[in-house]
Regions:
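Long C-terminal interaction/binding lobes of large macromolecular proteins
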Residues: 1-252
Length: 252
């Protein structure tokens, strides 16, 4: 006699980079084992790979996880975590209110701040992907040339981090991998897929410092997973607006 089958609930969500709703299910014991194995190794690459594998499993193989922009992957992971474990995550935040003057400080290490650790409850289903108003992926670098960028994926970032230790080389590699096309004033379009990685890196290396700063504006204003709340310190009563931004902010 066969054992009964447990019905797993299904949900849908909308990602910025995909027009159709994405189906997903909570992760199960077999996926939890993947996380635990990666956690035991302590290797960030293993942890990242485990997240990607679990997301692939829980979206029924219907979307290309490796092609998702990093912010969409983070949002999907947070929503999946909310349905699988608990919709509420508790994050500790240290109060930054200055409660002691310079004369009142006890020693040179005393910052004068309250410093009390406060638990903050974050409902994962209230997290949003925020796109800054000024954000654009079309960057004119001069009067004659415009670059169209595509968002970095987690897979790309992992490959770059694995191979590059030098900051300048890292920047060049990331920028070159995120170019989608280069457009000239006369309308000529050079698709990045038609160029070699070496050609794209050489193109980045010919940019001036001012042009690189324009390009970096694309990355500095990229969409992020965000949660806004009001912080109230249980120790000193200080209040301030507080924003959690990026995957790391949602976990201690």
């Amino acid at each position: 006699m066969s054992l009964p089958q447990i019905v797993t609930p299904e949900y849908t969500l909308q990602l910025n980079s995909i027009k159709e709703p994405v189906r997903y299910r909570p992760y199960l014991v077999r996926e939890e084992k993947i996380f635990l194995t990666a956690k035991e190794s302590g290797d960030p690459k293993d942890i990242e790979s485990s997240i990607r594998q679990v997301l692939k499993n829980c979206t029924f193989g219907e979307i290309d996880i490796d092609a998702l922009p990093s912010f969409d992957m983070e949002y999907l992971f947070l929503q999946l975590r909310g349905k699988s474990v608990n919709n509420i995550v508790t994050v500790k935040y240290q109060c930054q209110n200055k409660v002691r003057t310079e004369d009142e400080r006890t020693d040179e290490n005393d910052t004068g701040r309250c410093g009390a650790l406060n638990p903050i409850s974050v409902p994962l289903d209230e997290i949003k992907v925020v796109v800054p108003d000024e954000h654009t992926n079309i960057i004119p670098i001069n009067d004659d040339i415009t670059i169209e960028f595509q968002y970095p994926t987690i897979a790309v970032m992992q490959q770059v981090l694995t191979g590059k230790k030098d900051t300048v080389a890292f920047t060049t590699e990331v920028l070159s991998r995120c170019i989608k096309s280069i457009v000239e004033k006369d309308g000529t379009v050079h698709e990045a897929r038609d160029s070699t990685p070496e050609e794209l890196r050489e193109f980045i290396d010919t940019l001036s410092i001012q042009q690189i700063e324009r390009v970096q504006a694309f990355f500095n204003t990229m969409p992020t997973v965000t949660y806004d709340t009001t912080f109230a310190c249980s120790e000193c009563g200080y209040t301030e607006p507080l924003r959690f931004e990026g995957l790391q902010d949602f976990f201690d």
